[in-house]
Design a protein with these regions (language model features):
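N-terminal secretory signal peptides
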Residues: 1-10, 17-28
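Hydrophobic/aromatic-rich, well-ordered segments within soluble, folded domains that form packed cores
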Residues: 48-69, 192-213, 581, 588-593
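Noncatalytic, helix-rich "gating/capping" subdomain that lines the substrate-entry/channel surface
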Residues: 99-389
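Short, solvent-exposed loop/turn elements at domain surfaces
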Residues: 67-71, 188, 498
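Active-site-surrounding "flap" and adjacent substrate/cofactor-binding loops of secreted or lumenal enzymes
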Residues: 40, 54-57, 62-117
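Intrinsically disordered, low-complexity linker/terminal regions across diverse proteins
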Residues: 87, 266, 288, 292, ...
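Short, Gly/Pro- and small/polar-rich lid/capping loops
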Residues: 38-47
Length: 677
């Protein structure tokens, strides 16, 4: 159960290149960019602008229209935009750093990085090894004679399994870790198994399972694939939808171990837990159950399904996870599925996949090498200035709020004062020295890393929460708010142009990185984050009247987004306002507060906001395949980029003042329909 709120969706499909690396320190600057005396501050990037589109009608296409019309999406990408522009730029730096590692000493971080990279690059060896890397795990599955035996094996496998087990921070005691269980066990989004609009995805998945079963040596491959697909359909039917799973009230169900077992008495809990971890049983005396009704259904499905089908299910889950790193036939089968579900036409270059493997599995090891070279410690202080200005603007907003009563205002300001700001990279790094990465053995090395991470996670039980730990690597082009540590986190990689530029005018930095910072702070006060106090604990600090007022604003914003349909899609493919409301609230607050911080910085109540809004529009430049857009609409808690730009500004008086927006303009929103926070 994650408590983190990233700025953009992180779990991009695995065939895409992992996000970026860290920029040079020179990309950082004070918020007003006045430290460059040799040339005037740079304005917003207008190279993609379409002046035929009025900002009053469509700010997103006014800023990006020419680029959207002329840019051709590369055949190996599902999307490209400002975030991928930055990540592509720094991805090459990751490659260069890895290439600079020559004959590293055995057991060093450099050896781990280089050998993992080289193992991914050696496709001939991967093809030659065939199924050998998984043979030991297959033998364990086949050796399980009974369901209790198989439950123990399932717990030990590097998979989510039927019921997922993880470690989370206790929402009611943010200094303690708790084990958590919840829904798991699918190869696709649960919606793809039943909704008619995803029928082609289901067909492609069925084909993939058949090819994996054949390539994996399963007897009766087509029959095995169909039986596993039917099983996954049953599991998917028990899933909570993604609106319900983001409700932190509904997903916090603290149970004793006996109560957990009583939820699903048919499931073999004891052997499953012993396979999952060797930690003492008493550490599992209390467990958070995220989706209790799913657990109950999972127990029934476990009992009703023949053990032979479960064996095939686990084998196909392993093959699905590692197919792209095995024989050419299995890798090709995996990519054929990706082509259908994501709309890409060709694979990325092999080196990009290899960089992604290193970044995705040894990201902190790689990140430490990067920040040592490109991001000196003093750079944190320079970025902190802008954060401080945003916090000051938030404080002013709460103090002057017309809809919050004094007790709620005071509590909000108190929480704001306790926010921890983390910039660039962690102060201490995870020690991966005990992980064995073996040259020429990619899958075995990945299994070793996965086992290490699982053990590291389980070892947190019984220890105080480490609130200095990061949930992203420094080379990640993103940012996030963590609710149980009440922290905002800005990896080094996002602190560069076009998000943050030392040579840019203040308006540009406030419209770009300023709004990003405001967004992350805003998550502490969105529909879910507002349920926690400054120490990261669940606490109701709102008066009933203020809570009702906030709920009304939230419902109003949900209604605004529910009617939005991305360009080129049918009317039925509209934004899910309830799913995206947390991010929409953070987007709205983020830009609203950044506008206020801009005023504070310039010491005027009436600055020229034009360049700030243009920079805001540039933030959300993005082009996607239709398949990827459809997938995100169904699954992502973020709205499509065009609405993250346009719908936010429709609620802001500064936008109306700056561009003279009036009734009849397409972005005009009646005063009584606007949401003010």
């Amino acid at each position: 159960v994650s408590s983190s709120r990233p700025l953009v969706r992180l779990d991009r499909r695995s065939f895409l290149v992992a996000l970026g690396a860290v920029p040079v320190a020179a990309a950082l600057a004070s918020c007003n960019g006045n430290d460059s005396a040799s040339k005037p501050p740079a304005g917003p990037d207008l190279s993609g602008m379409d002046r035929a589109v009025r900002p009053q009608d469509d700010l997103f296409r006014h800023v990006n229209g020419t680029w959207l019309r002329t840019y051709q999406l590369p055949p190996d990408k599902t999307s490209f935009g400002t975030f991928t522009e930055v990540s592509d730029r720094v991805e090459g730096q990751l490659k260069d750093v890895i290439a600079g590692i020559v004959d590293p000493k055995d057991g060093t971080p450099e050896q781990q990085i280089r050998d993992l990279y080289d193992a991914r690059m050696d496709e001939a060896t991967l093809d030659k090894l065939g199924l050998t890397p998984l043979s030991g795990l297959f033998a364990q599955i086949d050796g399980a004679a009974t369901k209790p035996d198989l439950a123990k094996v399932m717990g030990a496998l590097p998979l989510g399994g039927l019921i997922g087990l993880g470690i989370t921070v206790d929402q009611k005691n943010s200094n303690a870790y708790l084990p958590s269980i919840g829904q798991s066990g699918l190869g696709m989004s649960e919606q793809y198994y039943s909704k008619p609009q995803f029928a082609q995805y289901l067909a492609a998945y069925s084909t993939l399972l058949g090819k994996l079963a054949a390539g994996g040596g399963l007897p009766d491959p087509n029959g095995s694939a169909q039986r596993v697909l039917d099983l996954e359909k049953q599991i998917a039917a028990a899933f909570w939808d993604n609106v319900r799973t983001r409700d932190s009230d509904a997903t916090y169900n603290l149970k004793s171990w006996d109560e957990v077992k009583a939820l699903a008495p048919e499931f073999d809990w004891e052997p499953w837990l012993s396979g999952s971890t060797d930690r003492p049983k008493e550490l599992f005396a209390k467990i958070v159950v995220a989706e209790p009704s799913f657990v109950t259904s999972a127990g029934r499905i476990w009992a009703a399904t023949d053990i032979a089908i479960w064996r095939d299910y686990l084998k196909l889950a392993l093959l699905r996870s590692y197919a792209k790193y095995m024989t050419k036939a299995l890798s090709d089968a995996n990519f054929e599925y990706v082509k259908v579900t994501a709309g890409v036409q060709q694979r990325p270059e092999l080196w990009k996949s290899a960089v992604g493997v290193v970044d995705g599995n040894l990201g902190e090891v790689l990140g430490k090498l990067y920040v040592a070279k490109y991001f000196p410690a003093e750079a944190k202080d320079r970025a902190k200035q802008l954060v401080d200005n945003l916090l000051a603007a938030y404080r002013q907003n709460f103090r002057n709020s017309s809809w919050m009563s004094p007790p709620t205002r005071d509590a909000a300001i108190a929480k704001l004062g306790k926010i921890t700001v983390k910039i660039g990279y962690p102060d201490k790094w995870v020690d991966y020295s005990k992980v064995k990465v073996t040259r020429g053995k990619l899958v075995e090395s990945l299994l070793a890393i996965t086992a290490f991470e699982a053990k590291r996670s389980m070892n947190k039980l019984g220890t105080p929460v480490d609130k200095t730990e990061w949930g992203m690597t420094p080379q990640t082009v993103n940012a996030y708010y963590d609710v149980t540590s009440n922290s905002i986190n800005f990896p080094a990689a996002i602190l560069q142009a076009p998000f943050f530029d030392k040579d840019a005018e203040a308006a540009v930095n406030y419209g770009a990185i300023g709004a990003v910072i405001g967004h992350e702070i805003g998550h502490g006060f969105d529909d879910q984050g507002s349920k926690y106090d400054g120490d990261g604990n669940r606490k109701d600090w709102w008066t009933p009247q203020d809570q009702a007022a906030f709920d009304a604003k939230t419902k109003q914003l949900i209604a605004q987004y529910d009617v939005l349909v991305p360009e080129g899609l049918p009317p039925t493919d509209h934004v899910n306002g309830a799913l995206t409301v947390g991010e929409n609230l953070a987007d709205l607050r983020g830009l609203m507060i950044s506008l206020a911080a801009f005023r504070i910085d310039l010491k005027t109540d009436k600055p020229n906001y034009t360049d700030m809004f243009l920079a805001w529009g540039r933030n959300w430049r993005e082009k996607q395949t239709t398949q990827y857009t459809e997938s995100l609409l169904a699954n992502d808690v973020h709205s499509p980029s065009e609405f993250r730009c346009n719908q936010v500004v429709r609620n802001l008086p500064e936008f109306y003042q700056t561009f003279g927006v009036k009734e009849g303009d397409k972005l005009f929103l009646a005063q009584d329909q606007r949401v003010s926070l």
